[in-house]
């Protein structure tokens, strides 16, 4: 039970102990720290009770291994899950502070970047809320991927120093440190006791992995699970002898080598050193996490052969899949198991989630790099590969084409997805269409050989962050109309459908949307200096920047609309605000050029008085969870326009839907299931189907030049990329122009079918405008999107993982 007076005293005490100040003298940032420590005090009681329950009930634990955890701010989320948000807000008001302002002092933890990391965060929230024992396992990046600045329209990457003031919601746990080894060589000697060879790793560089634990609170159930992120430190901190001899570089050499591992998420791998660092990162957190999990298991259990009965490792994409070989190494070299015993334990303990259809994103490592950096692990993968090839040969005698396609080591590379599929007891896709494409296209040979492993788990999102916290006005309205059960049972939202023809309810629903649009318009004015009209259609595309996600199609259409208004100033046109938010990987030149184009178009369009503000273009800098929450709540239209067959699932589409924004999209990823739930009449679908795209890719027959030569308006749009309309440098966007029309090297012209879908997209946008003019009709669409979003909760996804893959039991936490 939350005690307000005790909480106020705790905040004052924290200010005194942490800063030697009275509360009146404290800065906003210091108040944030003090409030967070007071909240953590409450959480720690639950955390201890949860650990006690796990010790007593000995449940099976899932270790969710992910390169990214895009958590978002913790203070507000924890208060929501503790059901203490209102009381803390009130307590702080009595102390003279505004909780919203305090929340704004918290940096977004820079532990992830895109949908992969946000999914992992939603899953942790659902696991805790559903009373399942789980650990998240990742890396404590010091600077994240980067903080995005926009200068002269270009993305500039600066370090995201989120830890500079310390982070109150983490606990350093040096007593659980592990050693991780890189490089060296493997010595083989005969072991007379076992009657076989013993493999001894020597001459390695050792790094200390230090765990930092972050609490993951369940909603209103006293459960607190753990996200364990690993920091790297040298075994020997500081070489005083070298320092005294004047060799200052050598004195800190080991520290620098260790620190490099955890400095940034996804270091640029356009060069060899970057590739090596990425592999180091992956092995570092996987090895430390496996060592910790096995140590925890052995505290209560003597028989390592039964590890899989109490532990399961879920590998989130290919980044952690080195876990297969590392688990084998630990079981054989440290626990003394033979190959067959270790293989049985491993193949019952590891499961793999595939997150991409893009074959270039399925990680492959050069043999030379892998074998040099991880010599013993590479030996094990060689043996797994040898045995796997024998299994393929046994099933498909003489079919060398199969071996070529399925081998784990082939053509000088180690193929991590193949390793995960060969060893994992489960392989899942993340939307129904995605899983079907994996089974019938990308991983067809594996599916034919072992169909029992493959299953689908459509992604989901946590409504506690993306509605209850992100959109409190709508959350309160929903609770008034159908009660609070939707917070832990999202399909309850279906009850809202009865209000789809209730004019009063529809008006209230749209009034809330308008207030959220006003809030976002204020943010845009403060951060971008652009005045946008909240009465305009807020058309939003926020997501990682990649060519297949087709931000380029969106901005080319904006240019097309701009041309239409310029040529026909008298035409009826409903004002639009096109909102973009996206980070491009530091080494991804094309994606960065698209950001520049969006900003160059914005500069021209926003400053052209002749169009009378009918179009505004806004690029929101440094898109992240905390500003995403405002954006989802305010959007009218959800742009989900990836090339069909390329987006595995998407979860932004679900967040927009939950907040009452109809989808404008292709039949790709989870869009297919969204349309099934809400009805095609409440979405705006366009473009080639996935079958049509795959057919063109496999058989040819698409030439964008035909469209360019026959469609004058499309030709005009493309010519404006290179004729000085948006830059005095006519060569600036030449590469984007060329990518749409000219085949280069192995890349087809317009490989993401932007021109093929352009007219269909423009027509869908016209349908959006016509629908929006019908206020009641639009309100009904918006309300029904919220009402039909119940399927897309991560609670449902996690329950499916539990039922079909992990087989966990619920844990009941009872505080004293």
Residue ranges, per PLM feature:
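A conserved ligand/cofactor-binding region detector
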Residues: 1-816
């Amino acid at each position: 039970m939350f005690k307000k007076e005790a909480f106020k005293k705790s905040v004052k005490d924290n200010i005194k102990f942490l800063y030697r100040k009275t509360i009146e003298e404290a800065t906003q940032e210091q108040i944030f720290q003090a409030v967070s420590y007071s909240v953590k005090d409450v959480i720690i009681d639950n955390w201890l009770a949860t650990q006690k329950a796990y010790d007593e009930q000995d449940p099976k634990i899932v270790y969710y291994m992910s390169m990214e955890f895009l958590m978002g701010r913790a203070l507000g989320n924890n208060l929501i899950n503790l059901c203490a948000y209102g009381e803390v807000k009130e307590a702080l008001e009595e102390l003279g502070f505004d909780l919203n302002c305090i929340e704004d002092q918290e940096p977004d933890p820079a532990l992830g970047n895109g949908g992969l990391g946000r999914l992992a965060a939603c899953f942790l929230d659902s696991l805790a809320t559903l009373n399942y024992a789980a650990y998240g396992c990742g890396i404590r990046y010091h600077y994240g991927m980067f903080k995005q600045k926009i200068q002269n329209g270009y993305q500039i990457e600066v370090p995201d120093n989120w830890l500079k003031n310390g982070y109150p919601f983490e606990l350093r746990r040096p007593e659980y440190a592990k050693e991780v080894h890189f490089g060296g060589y493997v010595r083989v000697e005969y072991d007379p006791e076992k009657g076989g060879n013993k493999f001894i790793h020597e001459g390695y560089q050792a790094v200390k992995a230090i765990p930092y634990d972050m609490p993951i609170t369940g909603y209103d159930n006293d459960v607190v699970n753990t996200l364990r992120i690993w920091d790297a430190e040298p075994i020997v901190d500081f070489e005083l002898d070298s320092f005294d001899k004047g060799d200052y570089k050598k004195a800190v050499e080991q520290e620098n080598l260790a620190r490099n591992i955890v400095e940034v998420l996804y270091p640029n791998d356009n060069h060899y050193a970057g590739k090596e660092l990425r592999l180091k990162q992956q092995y570092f957190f996987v090895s430390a996490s496996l060592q910790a999990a096995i140590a925890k298991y052995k505290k209560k259990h003597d028989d390592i052969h039964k590890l899989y009965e109490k532990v399961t490792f879920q590998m989130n994409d290919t980044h952690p899949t080195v876990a297969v070989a590392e688990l084998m190494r630990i079981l054989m070299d440290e626990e003394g198991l033979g190959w067959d015993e270790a293989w049985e334990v491993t193949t019952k303990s590891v499961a793999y989630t595939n997150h991409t259809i893009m074959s270039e994103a399925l990680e492959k490592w050069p043999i030379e790099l892998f074998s040099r950096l991880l010599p013993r692990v590479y030996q094990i993968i060689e043996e797994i590969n040898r045995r796997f090839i024998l299994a393929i040969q046994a099933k498909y005698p003489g079919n060398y084409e199969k071996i070529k396609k399925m081998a784990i080591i082939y053509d000088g590379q180690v193929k991590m997805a193949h390793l995960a599929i060969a060893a994992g007891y489960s392989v899942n896709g993340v939307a129904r269409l995605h899983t079907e494409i994996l089974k019938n296209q990308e991983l067809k040979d594996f599916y034919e050989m072992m169909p029992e492993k493959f299953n689908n788990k459509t992604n989901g999102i946590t409504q506690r962050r993306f509605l209850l916290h992100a959109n409190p006005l709508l959350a309160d309205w929903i609770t008034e109309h159908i009660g609070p059960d939707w917070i832990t049972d999202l399909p309850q939202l279906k009850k809202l459908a009865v209000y789809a023809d209730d004019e009063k309810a529809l008006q209230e629903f749209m009034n809330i949307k308008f207030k959220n649009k006003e809030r976002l318009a204020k943010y845009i004015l403060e951060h971008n200096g652009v005045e946008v009209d909240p009465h305009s259609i807020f058309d939003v595309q926020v997501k990682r920047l990649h060519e297949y996600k087709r931000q380029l199609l969106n901005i080319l259409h904006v240019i097309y609309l701009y041309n239409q208004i310029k040529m026909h100033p008298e035409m009826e046109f409903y004002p639009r605000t096109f909102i973009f938010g996206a980070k491009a990987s530091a080494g991804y030149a094309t994606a960065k050029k698209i950001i520049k184009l969006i900003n160059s178009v914005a500069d021209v369009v926003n400053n052209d008085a002749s169009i009378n503000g009918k179009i505004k273009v806004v690029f929101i800098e440094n898109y992240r969870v905390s500003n995403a929450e405002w954006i989802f709540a305010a959007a009218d239209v959800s742009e989900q326009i990836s090339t069909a067959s390329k987006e595995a699932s998407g979860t932004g589409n679900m967040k927009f839907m939950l907040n009452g924004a109809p989808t404008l999209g292709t039949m790709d990823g989870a869009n297919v299931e969204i349309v099934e739930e809400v009805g095609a009449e409440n979405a705006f679908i366009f473009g080639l189907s996935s079958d049509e795209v795959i057919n063109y890719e496999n058989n040819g027959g698409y030439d964008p030049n035909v469209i360019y030569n026959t469609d004058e308006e499309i030709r005009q749009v493309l010519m404006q990329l290179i004729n000085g309309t948006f830059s005095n440098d006519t060569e600036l966007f030449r590469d984007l122009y060329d990518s749409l029309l000219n085949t280069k090297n192995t890349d087809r012209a317009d490989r993401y079918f932007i021109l093929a879908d352009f007219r269909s997209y423009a027509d869908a946008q016209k349908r959006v405008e016509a629908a929006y003019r019908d206020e009641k009709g639009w309100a009904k669409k918006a309300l029904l999107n919220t009402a039909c979003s119940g399927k897309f909760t991560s609670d449902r996804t996690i329950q499916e993982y539990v039922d079909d893959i992990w087989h966990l039991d619920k844990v009941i936490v009872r505080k004293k």
